[in-house]
Amino acid sequence: MSKNEKLSAEEKALFRGLMSGTRQLSQDTIVHKPPRKKFNQVPVKRLLSEQMDASHYFSDEFQPLLASEGAVRYVRSDVSHYELKKLRRGDFTPEIFLDLHGLTQKQAKQELGALIAACRREHIFCASVMHGHGKHILKQQTPLWLAQHPWVMAFHQAPKLFGGDAALLVLIEVEEWLPPELP
């Protein structure tokens, strides 16, 4: 029967007669909520904790011994100077960039801490930190802060391609990647 066809009075009476001893059912269907999907995102609280932990190393009073002549550079004592040479030549391509333009020193420290924590978490070996020229405050402080951090292996003034003397290429010691354990 199509929707356009009307039922006759006789058909309606027959239907009502057949349904006379029945009662209406109440809705008893349980609607199951779909299971929540687990996100691979790091909780905000953990991100803030990592950022604060990583920026804890940055002191304005500590003055590490950096080369005073030539390009800004630093290599940790247990790291080969060849890594510094590869940084200078641009053999490493930064996978992540941080722009500190317009930030205060406190904000810049927090962002550097967050960058280092993110690099370790995401297994990123090389990063570019653009401090800019400006009033030379961040340009002077950024190398001093980076040299204090134990996870920074080396840094060098970036090649022109990545910002020249307004940026630094940083090598970060990443956590060893282990495949997930199978049950």
Swiss-Prot record:
HAMAP family: SmrB
EC number, UniProt record: 3.1.-.-
UniProt cross-references to Pfam families, sorted A to Z: Smr
Keyword Hydrolase: yes
PANTHER family assigned: DNA ENDONUCLEASE SMRA-RELATED (PTHR35562), UPF0115 PROTEIN YFCN (PTHR35562:SF1)
Organism name: Erwinia tasmaniensis (strain DSM 17950 / CFBP 7177 / CIP 109463 / NCPPB 4357 / Et1/99)
SUBUNIT field: Associates with collided ribosomes, but not with correctly translating polysomes.
Gene of this entry: smrB
Keywords (A to Z) from UniProt: Endonuclease, Hydrolase, Nuclease, RNA-binding, rRNA-binding
Protein name per Swiss-Prot or TrEMBL: Ribosome rescue factor SmrB
Family to which this protein belongs: Belongs to the SmrB family.
Keyword RNA-binding part of the UniProt annotation: yes
Residues annotated as domain Smr: 98-173
